[in-house]
Amino acid sequence: MIQTQNYGTGRRKSSSARVFLRSGNGEIVVNKRSLNEYFGRETSCMIVRQPLELVDMVDKFNIYITVKGGGISGQAGAIRQGITRALIKYNQTLRFELRKAGFITRDSRQVERKKVGFRKARKRPQFSKR
C-alpha cells in the first residue's frame, strides 16, 4: 500500500528541516527520536506544534522530520516553517490562516558577521579621549 505524504522544507538561521506529513495519530518524530526527547524544553515543542494547533490538526498526522544545522531555537523555527508548507500542500485553503499567523514568512534574520578591529559584530574597543 502506497501511503500519501506531503513534503515541506523550512529554514531558519543556519538550520534546515525536511518535513514529511502522513495521515496518522499525531506522532512527531525528529531525527528518529520523539519530539520531547529531541528538544527537551517545552517552548521548542510548542513552537513546532503551533501550525497544527492553529488549524486543529494535531491528531490527524504523523510527522517525520530530519533537521540539520544551527541550535535548538533555529531548528524549532525551521521545523515550524516546514510543517506549515506541508500543510499548505495538503490543503490550500489553510494558506490564509497560516499567513495571518505569520508562519509562512521565512524569518530572514541571520547572525551579523564580526568586523575587523571590533570585539564582536558591533562592539568597538573602549574609546579613550586622552
Curated annotation (Swiss-Prot):
In terms of HAMAP family, this protein maps to:
Ribosomal_uS9_B
A single GO cellular-component term from the record reads: cytosolic small ribosomal subunit
Q: Which InterPro entries match?
A: Ribosomal_Su5_D2-typ_SF, Ribosomal_uS9, Ribosomal_uS9_bac/plastid, Ribosomal_uS9_CS, Ribsml_uS5_D2-typ_fold_subgr
* Keyword Isomerase on entry: no
Gene3D superfamilies, A to Z: 3.30.230.10
Q: What is this protein called?
A: Small ribosomal subunit protein uS9
Entry keywords, A to Z: Ribonucleoprotein, Ribosomal protein
The source organism is Buchnera aphidicola subsp. Acyrthosiphon pisum (strain Tuc7)
Q: Which GO terms describe its molecular function?
A: RNA binding; structural constituent of ribosome
Asked if the keyword Ribonucleoprotein belongs to this entry, the reply reads: yes
Please state the gene responsible for encoding this protein.
rpsI
Q: Which GO terms describe its biological process?
A: translation
Task: Give coiled-coil spans as residue ranges.
Answer: none
Q: Which family does it belong to?
A: Belongs to the universal ribosomal protein uS9 family.
